[in-house]
Amino acid sequence: MKIATKFLGEVEIANQDILTFEHGLLGLEEERKFVLLPIDADLPLALLQSVQHVEIGFVVAYPFAFKKDYSFDISEEDREQLQIEKQEDVLAYAIVTMKETFQDSTINLLAPVILNIAKKRGKQIVLQDNKAFPLRYPMQPLEGSAK
């Protein structure tokens, strides 16, 4: 099926690519169907786009590429909601606040978006140790691994 996106125009997606966020995203609790679209193969960035609303789309970054010591635990409750069975099925992204220049942009390390790629489920979680990682972390030149 074709969907209109906020940043990439019209794209073709398959039903099996749709991610379900049972509780939506923070502030968008009613928005539950998203798709993850690549932006540039050379950058650890993607577009998390609502399937239903063109105006709801977020640039997301692979946070470990920008902060190599970024780490957190996923609670048992979140693991159950996401139906996580194997660690290799899990991907984490951070929502990007885009500014005029890439260097002025920030990523939200406080509330990562966790995806279970195998089960096509997602959830944005708020880290309990909220002093460890900021809401607006500067997007420095890549310091970690993008893989």
Swiss-Prot record:
GO CC entries: cytoplasm
Superkingdom of origin organism: Bacteria
Subcellular location(s) of the protein: Cytoplasm
Primary residence: cytoplasm
Matches recorded under NCBIfam families: PRK13285.1-1 (NF009793)
InterPro entries, sorted: Flagellar_assembly_factor_FliW, Flagellar_assmbl_FliW_dom_sf
Protein name from the UniProt record: Flagellar assembly factor FliW
Gene: fliW
Source organism per UniProt: Lysinibacillus sphaericus (strain C3-41)
Job of this protein: Acts as an anti-CsrA protein, binds CsrA and prevents it from repressing translation of its target genes, one of which is flagellin. Binds to flagellin and participates in the assembly of the flagellum.
Pfam families: FliW
Keywords: Bacterial flagellum biogenesis, Chaperone, Cytoplasm, Translation regulation
Protein family per UniProt: Belongs to the FliW family.
GO biological process terms on file: bacterial-type flagellum assembly; regulation of translation
Subunit structure: Interacts with translational regulator CsrA and flagellin(s).
